[in-house]
């Protein structure tokens, strides 16, 4: 199977990737198991030194990695650069604090001596999303590897270029072969990977549907699972709020990463006394945000990561309007680009109220 990486801003193909064969996949899983035998015995000090080196490589090559993020999923370059720097920070943070985090903790029981100790469990599968293609991986990988585990990455298929770069960073840092590996595979192979005796756990960040499917597989094969799923967060504004401050916060909370975040503010619940003022100022603020080529440093709003994602958002907008929502701003779509959109008078029963909206849509309630 071939996977294509496509620039969502202009539709140009960036690269093509061939899926691993079943034999190649099993070989990588077995390599991870072999690497675990040595990695778990590697001193914590050595592991910390290597993760610190990962942080240095991220910092030194931040612009190169940020450009790949922007090309593959359309994030404005300024945000991509911030993402890479945050990845360096998380590596430094865990490397500096690993000793404290992994130290034994004495606890009181009826026994003469009781304590909690931390031991690695083996190979961990990471199923990661496209919206923060570097951050989601490094916030998993740094603590996982420092704890003595090995990792297999199954990234979203539209950001395989980022995934390849991430694996290369660990190689350049001197992390032993097999400790961190990227798998170019279809999501249909998830059960094959999870069912393998070498894989002890899975960490997934993604949709509720994906999480439900992976949790079921983990349960079937009695593997540990850690899930971070979607959200439809409410942003509540009271009548005594500083409206200007609330609007400034709301613009960032809704529009960061073009609204493609599980923790983004999506539904704005406004008390009657400040509804008009907030909506007016929020609309004015949104109109000042610059849309355009995400590689340009002053661009604030780029395309969504894929055309089908923009199509889905457009469907949610139209259905909400059909059910009585008022279009206050935007509403248009061209390919992967969706205009920043504000809907007013949003009520239960509308997609803008009931569903997670993964894009630049603000629902005023």
Residue ranges and their predicted role:
Residues 11, 47, 69, 91, ...:
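Residue-level signal for inorganic ion chemistry
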Residues 15-19, 35-41, 126, 235-238, ...:
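Short, well-ordered beta-strand elements within core beta-sheets of diverse protein domains
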